[in-house]
Amino acid sequence: MFLLYEYDFFWAFLIISILVPILAFLISGVLAPISKGPEKLSTYESGIEPMGDAWLQFRIRYYMFALVFVVFDVETVFLYPWAMSFDVLGVSVFIEAFIFVLILIIGLVYAWRKGALEWS
């Protein structure tokens, strides 16, 4: 029998986590003073006048490093629970984790050989 009352805490948390940001935006929009002027339109750069154009295009190298970082950060998120319950899970899960890491290493070697990790 499927009992929906077991999920009451989940639904309450979901509704609260949706309502809190919405209410924060609405309240700040109502209470914030409306002031427009040249100070609001100027670029802020550490309290001093900006030197040159404030809008600079990032190099694609930063994007590639960020992408590789995110991939290996997600790998850590997946492997940490596995490492904490390694003795309970057995050999089959070890093989699955090994294949997962192997695929990521192959991707890293591919990115390295393509020159995605070099600054030149």
Curated annotation (Swiss-Prot):
Subcellular location: Plastid, Chloroplast thylakoid membrane
InterPro entries referenced in this protein's UniProt entry, alphabetically: NAD(P)H_OxRDtase_bac/plastid, NADH_UbQ/plastoQ_OxRdtase_su3, NDAH_ubi_oxred_su3_sf
Top-level EC class as recorded in UniProt: translocase
Highest taxon of the lineage: Eukaryota
Presence of keyword Signal: no
Keywords: Chloroplast, Membrane, NAD, NADP, Plastid, Plastoquinone, Quinone, Thylakoid, Translocase, Transmembrane, Transmembrane helix, Transport
Membrane-spanning segments: 9-29, 64-84, 88-108
GO cellular component: chloroplast thylakoid membrane; NADH dehydrogenase complex
EC numbers for this chain: 7.1.1.-
Oligomeric form and interacting partners: NDH is composed of at least 16 different subunits, 5 of which are encoded in the nucleus.
Name of the protein this chain belongs to: NAD(P)H-quinone oxidoreductase subunit 3, chloroplastic
Species, as recorded: Nicotiana sylvestris
